[in-house]
Amino acid sequence: MVKGEYGMNLPSHQRGASVTGIVIMIVLIVVCAKIGLAIIPAQVGHYQLKKSLAFELKKSNDNKESVKEFLGNVNSQWHINGVSQKAEDVVEVVDNTPGEMSVKLKYDEANNFFGNVDIVNRFEDTISAEDAKVAKP
């Protein structure tokens, strides 16, 4: 112990966090939370989009539908689900054999981080006919 002015006993080493350390920790927590709030909804939305696309692909392959019918069904389902994208813009048909159709889902989603800084999520998945066979609604 160090004897301070006015006869107080002061510790010779600081214990605990300083004000600067606490402020830095709060800023880091806020930045991590903000990044999480920008990324997590995009990931959840992509999961739902991929799941609905796989189920529509399963139905289309079971009914041996054409690419045009498949994309029409996907657009109808996405409209019901409130998806703003059009299937023609984000879905590419890899194999268009009726009953064995495979597709590639590819798109970007940008979320504002702050000011003019955006977080861009790029998604690219291929759903084969085999993958679609096990799809559930």
Task: Tell what function each PLM region has.
Residues Y6-V23:
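Glycine-centered recognition micro-motifs in short, flexible terminal segments and loops
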Residues G21-G36:
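Hydrophobic membrane-insertion alpha-helices, especially the h-region
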Residues I40-K58:
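Alpha-helical transmembrane signal-anchor/signal-peptide segments
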Residues G21-I22, E100, P137:
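Charge-rich alpha-helical segments
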Residues N112-P137:
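Low-complexity, S/T/G/P-rich flexible repeat/linker segments used as non-globular hinges
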Residues K59-M101:
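Short amphipathic secondary-structure patches
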Residues G45, A87-D89, G99-V103, Y107, ...:
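Envelope-exposed proteins and targeting segments
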